Amino acid sequence: MKILFCDLLLLSLFSSVSSSCQKDCLVCREKLRPTLDSFSLEMCILECEEKAFTSPLWTPCTKVMARGSWQLSPADPDHVAAALDQPRASEMQHLKRMPRVRSLFQRQKRTEPGLEEVGEIEQKQLQKRFGGFTGARKSARKLANQKRFSEFMRQYLVLSMQSSQRRRTLHQNGNA
């Protein structure tokens, strides 16, 4: 039973490894959903990985993907992931035509700071305080509370060290 469980675990680990063929076939299935009723994801992956002979299933995938902004390539998984995350150019043009969105795009272009300004802004927002970073807007009261708490901790540590030293000396002298 343990051997069967270990085999199953190993197989699940290997199947969870991300490959571009899996992504390509998933995208293809989504694009061809209305036209292909008998789409087999497993066969598509096998054909993509060139473990099976090219069949009529992989050819429409490559054609449909070539027409769009998608590209099927087992050697370049980053391109497919980037294409999945990026909106299409036509969608972006449609959004830019809308007045509210267009004004947001223009504002973003105007307010993009330079590299030097970004460094200055980051330096203003973060200040090193008591071993951690706190925002520049943090109130003086909170910082005073941190100082007071750290002072309490110091006193506690000093007292606990002194008491442990007393116990050790008493124990060594045989008075315990």
From Swiss-Prot:
It is found in: Secreted. Keywords: Cleavage on pair of basic residues, Disulfide bond, Neuropeptide, Neurotransmitter, Opioid peptide, Secreted, Signal. It comes from the Eukaryota. One of its GO terms (cellular component) is dendrite. The keyword Cell wall biogenesis/degradation does not apply. Residues 1-19 form the signal peptide. GO terms for molecular function: opioid peptide activity. Its main location: secreted. Residues 20-95, 169-176 form a propeptide. GO terms for biological process: chemical synaptic transmission; neuropeptide signaling pathway; sensory perception. Specific enzymatic cleavages at paired basic residues probably yield other active peptides besides nociceptin. The N-terminal domain contains 6 conserved cysteines thought to be involved in disulfide bonding and/or processing. The keyword Signal applies. Pfam families: Opiods_neuropep. Belongs to the opioid neuropeptide precursor family. This is Prepronociceptin. It comes from Bos taurus (Bovine). The gene is PNOC.
